Amino acid sequence: MTLTFLLVVALCMLTTCHTENYRDSQKVSPVRSIGKTQFARSLRLSERYCVPKSGLCTIFQPGKCCSGWCLIYRCT
């Protein structure tokens, strides 16, 4: 892990990242307050399943984002 990645994780933990609108049938409630383990799990699930509700996705993962926002997944 790089220092930048750790910094992003630390900052993102201070925000909210909602994970919903999954492509498969799995239903997961929005994550409002996430810890390290939940963040890691949320990040992996987001890379695989999260799709934007509207707009463009920016920062690190173009085309992949959560319906809400955090520093890694952002819908604008």
Curated annotation (Swiss-Prot):
MF term (GO), any: ion channel inhibitor activity
Keyword Signal among UniProt keywords: yes
Protein name listed in UniProt: Conotoxin Cl6.4
Organism whose genome encodes this protein: Californiconus californicus (California cone)
Superkingdom classification of source: Eukaryota
Subcellular location: Secreted
GO CC field: extracellular region
UniProt entry keywords in alphabetical sequence: Disulfide bond, Knottin, Neurotoxin, Secreted, Signal, Toxin
Pfam family, one: Conotoxin
InterPro entries: Conotoxin
Positions of disulphide bridges: 50-66, 57-70, 65-75
Entry annotated with the keyword Transcription: no
Propeptide residue span(s): 20-47
Domain notes: The presence of a 'disulfide through disulfide knot' structurally defines this protein as a knottin. The cysteine framework is VI/VII (C-C-CC-C-C).
Signal peptide bounds: 1-19
Tissues in which the protein is found: Expressed by the venom duct.
